[in-house]
C-alpha cells in the first residue's frame, strides 16, 4: 500500500491520496496555525479504525439480509502523553456501534461486530497492539 501527502498551503493543510485516488484533507489545529481545512491526523486514525470495521459489519449483515436503515459508529480515543516526548498516542479506544432497522437480529449484529473486531479488520489488528480497544452496541427498531 502506498499513499501520497501533498502540502496545500504554507501552513498545515495537506491533501492525501492513495490507490483509490480519493482525496482526503488534513490540517493542524488553529492553536498551532492550522485553518480547520481538514481533519486532524489522530481523528483520521479513529475514522480509519471505525471505517474498517463498518465495511466488514455491513458486508456481513447484507449477506444475512438484515434491513439496516441507519448505522453509525461513534469512536472515542483516550490519549496519554509519553514521558520525555510530546507524543500522545491512543491508549484506550471505544467504538459504539449504533444500528436502526426493521426486525434486526441482535445475535447477528453482535456476531458481525465480533468477527470484524477479532478476525477481519486489519486496522483493529494494527491498533490493538498499542491501545486497548473495546466496543458496545445499541440497536433501535424502526
Short names for language-model regions:
Residues 1-47, 58-142:
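Extended beta-strand/beta-hairpin segments
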Amino acid at each position: 500500500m502506498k499513499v501520497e501527502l501533498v502540502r496545500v498551503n504554507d501552513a498545515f493543510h495537506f491533501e492525501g491520496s492513495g490507490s483509490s485516488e480519493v482525496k482526503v484533507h488534513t490540517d493542524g489545529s488553529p492553536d498551532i496555525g492550522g485553518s480547520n481545512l481538514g481533519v486532524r491526523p489522530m481523528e483520521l486514525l479513529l475514522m480509519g479504525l471505525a471505517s474498517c470495521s463498518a465495511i466488514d459489519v455491513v458486508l456481513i449483515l447484507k449477506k444475512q439480509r438484515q434491513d439496516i436503515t441507519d448505522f453509525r459508529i461513534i469512536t472515542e480515543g483516550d490519549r496519554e502523553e509519553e514521558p520525555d516526548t510530546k507524543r500522545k498516542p491512543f491508549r484506550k479506544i471505544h467504538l459504539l456501534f449504533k444500528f436502526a432497522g426493521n426486525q434486526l437480529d441482535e445475535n447477528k449484529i453482535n456476531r458481525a461486530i465480533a468477527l470484524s473486531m477479532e478476525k477481519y479488520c486489519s486496522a483493529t489488528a494494527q491498533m490493538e497492539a498499542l491501545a486497548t480497544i473495546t466496543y458496545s452496541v445499541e440497536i433501535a427498531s424502526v
